[in-house]
C-alpha cells in the first residue's frame, strides 16, 4: 500500500528488502561453513545487480510500480494454481521441483490478459506493454530459479525461518527484486 499512499516510502522499503536479502545470502554462506566460495561470490554479484535495478524500481512513477507489482503477484499466484491443476512437466526438478511448464504458461497467459485489463496504469504502447510485461515475468522467474539454485547448493529449503512457513525475505521477494530490476531497466531505456 505504500506504493500508492507514499510512493517514496516504497523506495526505502526496496533498500531494506535488498539489504535483508543480502544478509540472508551471507548468513547462509557462513552457516554452510564457507563452502562454495566462487559460487557465493558470483551469486552475490548477480544479486547486487538485481538489487541495483530493484532500488531504481522504487523510484519509478507509482502507477508503473503498482502495475509491475500487480502483474508479478498475478503471475506468482496463477503459476501456482495452474501448475497444480495442469502442471505435469517439471521444468528444472533438481533446482525447483515445484515449477512446471503448465504453471509458467498458465501464469504468463493470465498475467498478459491482466496487463491489458490494467492498461490504465501503464503509459506506453501496446507493444511496450507486452515487452514490459513479458520481460518482468521472465526476470521474476529467473530470479526465483536463481534463489532456488542458491538454496539447493547450500542444501536448505528456505533462506531462514523469519516468517514461519514462508521462509525469509528472499523466499518472499526474489521475484519482486528481479522483476523490479527489469521494470526499472525497461523504463529507463524505452519508456521515459
Model-derived features: positions:
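Short, conserved aromatic-histidine micro-motifs
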Residues: 128-129, 173, 192
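Membrane-embedded alpha-helical bundles of polytopic integral membrane proteins
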Residues: 1-139
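Juxtamembrane boundary at the C-terminal end of a transmembrane helix
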Residues: 185-192
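Interfacial loop-to-transmembrane junctions
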Residues: 153-176
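Juxtamembrane interface at the ends
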Residues: 85, 148-156
Amino acid at each position: 500500500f505504500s506504493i500508492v499512499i507514499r510512493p517514496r516510502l516504497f523506495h526505502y522499503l526496496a533498500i531494506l528488502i535488498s539489504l535483508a536479502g543480502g544478509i540472508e545470502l551471507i548468513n547462509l554462506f557462513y552457516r554452510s561453513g564457507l563452502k562454495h566460495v566462487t559460487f557465493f561470490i558470483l551469486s552475490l554479484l548477480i544479486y547486487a545487480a538485481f538489487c541495483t535495478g530493484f532500488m531504481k524500481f522504487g523510484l519509478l512513477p507509482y502507477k508503473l510500480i503498482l502495475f509491475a507489482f500487480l502483474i508479478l503477484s498475478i503471475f506468482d499466484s496463477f503459476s501456482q494454481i495452474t501448475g497444480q491443476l495442469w502442471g505435469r512437466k517439471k521444468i528444472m526438478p533438481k533446482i525447483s521441483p515445484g515449477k512446471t511448464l503448465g504453471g509458467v504458461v498458465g501464469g504468463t497467459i493470465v498475467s498478459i490478459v491482466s496487463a491489458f485489463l490494467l492498461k490504465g496504469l501503464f503509459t506506453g504502447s501496446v507493444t511496450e506493454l507486452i515487452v514490459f510485461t513479458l520481460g518482468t515475468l521472465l526476470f521474476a522467474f529467473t530470479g526465483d530459479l536463481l534463489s532456488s539454485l542458491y538454496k539447493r547448493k547450500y542444501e536448505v529449503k528456505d533462506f531462514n525461518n523469519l516468517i514461519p512457513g514462508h521462509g525469509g525475505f528472499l523466499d518472499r521477494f526474489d521475484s519482486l527484486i528481479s522483476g523490479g530490476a527489469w521494470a526499472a531497466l525497461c523504463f529507463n531505456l524505452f519508456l521515459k
